């Protein structure tokens, strides 16, 4: 198995028309990853969410990390940010998909030391996806454990 890329993304939800919130999310992702995020436009129209395909403001922002920046971000995530999560018992073991990729949800961005107090005035979550070239989830989990990601024990906590 091989770690191909890390995608850090954040959906803006009901704040998609709020320019200030969009700016906060963009600045947060830029400070955390060191790269400028790309706005994601809706692919499908969903009437109940008042979203039209390809129209209006972005519904989310994402950054794709590869190479040295990917490993640097992973190191900061594992050694600095994860220990700062309140009531953290390990990363969830259910975040693997069939292809062996791993998804990690972070409930608030304040765990990253790059962000100051004014950057965390409005809290929002992040999604971190580890795209792994692997045959199954067991191989991917073993790879991520070697990198140092602490997973929950099999029996719960």
Predicted regions and their residues:
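Ribosome-associated RNA-binding proteins
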Residues: 1-157
């Amino acid at each position: 198995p091989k770690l191909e890329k890390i995608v850090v993304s954040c959906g803006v939800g009901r704040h998609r028309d709020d320019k200030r919130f969009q700016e906060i999310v963009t600045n947060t992702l830029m400070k955390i990853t060191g790269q400028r995020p790309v706005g994601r436009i809706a692919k499908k129209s969903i009437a109940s969410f008042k979203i039209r395909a390809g129209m209006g403001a972005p519904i989310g922002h994402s950054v794709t990390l590869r190479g040295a920046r990917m490993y640097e971000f992973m190191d900061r995530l594992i050694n600095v940010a994860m220990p700062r999560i309140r009531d953290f018992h390990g990363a969830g073991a259910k975040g693997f998909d069939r292809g062996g990729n791993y998804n990690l949800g972070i409930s608030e961005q304040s765990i990253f030391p790059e962000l100051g107090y004014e950057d965390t005035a409005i809290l929002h979550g992040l999604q971190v996806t580890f795209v792994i070239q692997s045959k199954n989830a067991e191989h991917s989990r073993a790879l991520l454990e070697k990198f140092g990601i602490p997973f929950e024990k099999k029996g719960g906590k």
